[in-house]
């Protein structure tokens, strides 16, 4: 049976680590290297991974706000596309107070259940312990306007940490868990690690920051609900590598992404409505031998601005 889980495992857009180099208003510590995003969540980089101009003298101080908006040539989440390899737009807002934060994002998607958009709501705490920047939180994913009878909303908890080896080099690791990915009855677990290197600023034009980064993640699952076949979703590894350019509030990320999913398992995992026959037949989860290109090698360009 085909699983409409594709959104759920949206692709690892892990646009991780947008280096904080280009923001004159930021402190020397922040300019060194922004946290690497190993969450794989969202059509935009996570707030703590995106450099931008600072909203100074906020009347709500010490309550801080951030805003991000942009577009991308594809929406890759944990290695698979959530936009059928079509361009997307997205925006995000976040409020933080001391260690605590809450935020929301909206992004265009193209999924089997035809939702109007992907909305995410998240919150958590970001403490610093032993020079490690931690992030413990939860995310609720909502897909309004789905086809009649479909409901793939779900929630996920996560923990991740970022550590600076030097002012220019950061490593990160994260773990996420959902009791029912895409409301399909199957639990999901996700683990990832990443590395980022900021190029020396003396080698670059004024106000330009450049970083190289990469992430490797592993996604595995339990059995789906009996109504969806009761079989386990295919576990897989994904990876990406790219370069991020930053100048003040503007950011450009160019990234290569791929997974080790076969085209047949890609269909099983995503439920791609455009899948075609011609692959290996599996009488349990793919009796027609359908194949999908939603999980293969992809080049993604992403442009956005960030106000922090």
Regions found by a protein language model. Give the residues of each.
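Residues that define the transmembrane beta-barrel architecture of outer-membrane proteins
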Residues: 61-63, 85-89, 115-119, 132, ...
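Outer-membrane beta-barrel "beta-signal"
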Residues: 195-199, 245-250, 276-281, 291-308
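Short loop/turn motifs that connect adjacent beta-strands in outer-membrane beta-barrel proteins
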Residues: 53-64, 113, 128-133, 149, ...
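Solvent-exposed loop segments that connect transmembrane elements
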Residues: 223-232, 263-291
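Transmembrane beta-strands of outer-membrane beta-barrel pores
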Residues: 71-77, 97-99, 106-110, 127, ...
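Outer-membrane beta-barrel biogenesis signature
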Residues: 26-67, 77-80, 200
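Transmembrane beta-strands of outer-membrane beta-barrel proteins
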Residues: 65-69, 91, 100-104, 121, ...
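Detector for outer-membrane/organellar transmembrane beta-barrel domains
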Residues: 154-234, 256
